[in-house]
Structure formats: C-alpha cells, structure tokens
C-alpha cells in the first residue's frame, strides 16, 4: 500500500519526536525496525512509544504484500516487526519466516478479541506467530455528490454491479476511477460476483475473473494501493475499489479540509473480502526484546483505540472498544454488524503455481496484453 518517506513526511516525523535512524545505532542504543503499510499509524503513537521506553523507531512503509514478502524471503530484511496480511502470513509461516511469539512477553494480548483471533487461527493455527493489528474489508469508496449526479439522487452504490458492469463504470470514467493494485483483492471480488468461489484455484475460474476485470479496464484511471486515499479526499477521483479504513480516512481528510467533498463507503450486497493485518517478528530479527515491547505497546487498549480513531479501521483489541469514538464503533462499514459479517468472506493462501497464474493474469489485466 513500497512507499518511502517523502521530505514532508520525514520532517513531520522528526517534528513529532520519534527517531528515523539513518546511521548504525551505537551498541548502547535501543532500536526497533518497523515495516508497516502506508498510512497505517496514528501520527503520535510511535513518538509516544519512544518517549515512554527510550527505544528509537526506524519506520519504513510498503504498499503491497508482495513487497514485504520479497524482503522477508530474501533474508536479512533488517526488520524486527512487520505487518503481513493473513493470507500471506499463512504461507510465510510454512516458509519459517517468523519466530513463534513468546506470549509471556506480551501481557497485553489478554485484550485480544476472540472473534478476531478465531478468524486469524485459520491462517495461524493456535495463534502462535502473529497478533492482529487492524482488520477491515475491501469495498467501494465513492464521492457521494458525483455518484448522485451520475446515477441520480436515489443511487445505490452497494453492489458490485457498479464496478463490474462496463456500462455502469463507464459513467464514472471522466471523474476518475482507481482500483487496488492487488489481484488478491480484485480477483476474489470478481469471482464472487460471477457466483464462483472467491477462493477458487481453478485456472478456468481465474481466467473468467481476469476477463471480467479486463472488460472494465478501459474505465480505470489507475491501479494503485495507496494513492487513492488522497485522490478521493481532494475530489481528484470519484470511485475506488479500496480498503475500508483508507476510504474512511479520505472521508475524514475531506471533512477537515472543508472542501465540499463528501465520501461514502459501501460493502457490496453480493459479499466482500474481510482481511486481517497482523504484527509478527521475523526469524532473523536483531532487536527481539524491543520488538516485543513495541507489539505489547500497540496492544494497550488506549493505543489501539488511538490508532482506530485515526485510521478508521477496526482492531483486534476488544478492550479498546470502550475508548473508540462511538461514530467509528457504531459504523457498520468499520465494525460490521452480524448481518454484514454474514456477507463477508476470507481468502486463504494459494500454492505457488496458482499464485504465478494469478500474477500473470493480473499483469495481463493491467497492461491490456
């Protein structure tokens, strides 16, 4: 969602008070190297961690699971805490990429939400290697006024028909459509829309999903997994297939800017993917004690709530819900109710051969060749 630090972000981070370490740390320094998704941390959380513990944080970001996985598989990644999505976590555990968590060093895991840990155990049996950080859904973000202008005042956006019927998406082309650069999000949605298993590994099914997305390709301005947040907030685009919390962050930014852009998010009635992003410690981490301190800190109810309040993502910390803004906690697009949860599905890990097919088809979709 790999994005480096821009000059503005670097200055902001330094002003916030946490360390971006560019030179080797002295032996007496305590440091933790943290590799997280773009736009996935409240601004003062790491600064406060440094103030409380004296541990410097080297913070880098990425915007695709494949980027993280490539770094981890190569070995000697240099990171102590990383944030893989669950369906990647599953195969990474098999590849012995992560250390088992010593839960005696993570007392705040007592705050974990059983519903989330149960889902996560599908990928990490026994919850041995990872703790949930945030979770959300893949759905449709849209500019409310533009959607009403295009489709009428009573327009409904809560269907994949808006995206996967070319005649519908074509209406949004001029005001701008973005789509996640993630086959693992788009193909399952397309498969479900076609009435197929979102987890299908049959090449014929995957070809059908690719063909469906190829038909709407002419109306997609950009495939990217983080730029849409700003573009939606400023009114540069009017429709995106994106992640729930990112769309909600765009909504908050637009409201703060008072730019007249009103943003909505919909979980399509046909069903949508539910994903889990998780905290894990690489097997070759060099600062393990500091990694445990960071994960335990992030699992404090007040810290988890601060992140959810800023990010508009649900988290895996049940105790934090008492501290979460009611507007977020009661928003069914962020914390889905039972009816909405019943429409959600999760993605399981694919074998390498299937993943190669998916990657090839995704390249074909994006390039049109």
Which residues are covered by each model-predicted region?
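Ligand-binding pocket segment of bilobal, Venus flytrap-like solute-binding proteins
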Residues: 171, 175-264
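Short beta-strand->loop
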Residues: 99-110, 161, 257-273, 282-284
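Bacterial N-terminal signal peptides
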Residues: 9-21
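Mature extracytoplasmic/periplasmic domains
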Residues: 277, 282-343
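Sec/Tat signal peptide C-region and signal peptidase I cleavage site
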Residues: 21-27
């Amino acid at each position: 969602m790999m994005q480096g630090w821009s000059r503005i972000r670097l200055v902001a981070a330094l002003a916030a008070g946490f360390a971006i370490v560019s030179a080797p740390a002295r032996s007496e320094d305590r440091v933790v190297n943290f590799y997280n998704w773009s736009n996935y941390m409240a601004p003062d959380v790491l600064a406060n961690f440094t103030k409380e513990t004296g541990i410097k944080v080297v913070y880098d970001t990425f915007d695709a699971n494949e980027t993280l996985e490539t770094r981890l598989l190569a070995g000697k990644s240099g990171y102590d805490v990383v944030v893989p999505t669950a369906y990647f976590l599953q195969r990474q555990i098999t590849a012995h990429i992560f250390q088992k968590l010593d839960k005696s060093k993570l007392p705040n895991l007592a705050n974990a939400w059983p519903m989330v840990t149960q889902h996560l155990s599908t990928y990490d049996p026994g919850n041995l290697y990872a703790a949930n950080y945030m979770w959300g859904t893949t759905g449709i973000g849209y500019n409310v006024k533009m959607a009403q202008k295009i489709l009428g005042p009573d327009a409904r956006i809560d269907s994949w028909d808006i995206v996967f019927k070319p005649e519908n998406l074509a209406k949004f082309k001029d005001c701008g459509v973005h789509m996640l650069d993630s086959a693992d999000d788009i193909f399952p949605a397309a498969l479900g829309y076609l009435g197929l298993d979102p987890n299908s590994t049959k090449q014929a099914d995957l070809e059908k999903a690719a063909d469906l997305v190829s038909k709407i390709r002419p109306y997609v301005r950009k495939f990217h997994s983080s730029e849409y947040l700003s573009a939606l907030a400023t009114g540069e685009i009017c429709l995106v297939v994106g992640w729930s919390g990112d769309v909600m962050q765009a909504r908050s930014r637009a409201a703060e800017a008072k730019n007249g852009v009103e943003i909505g998010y919909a979980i399509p009635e046909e069903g949508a993917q539910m994903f889990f992003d998780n905290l894990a410690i690489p097997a070759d981490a060099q600062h393990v004690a500091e990694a445990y301190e960071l994960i335990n800190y992030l699992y404090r109810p007040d810290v988890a709530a601060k992140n959810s309040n800023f990010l508009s993502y649900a988290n895996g910390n049940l105790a934090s819900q008492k501290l979460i803004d009611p507007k977020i906690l009661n928003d069914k697009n962020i914390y889905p109710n039972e009816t909405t949860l019943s429409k959600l599905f999760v993605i399981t890990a694919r074998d390498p051969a299937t993943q190669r097919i998916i990657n090839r088809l995704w390249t074909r979709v994006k390039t049109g060749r």
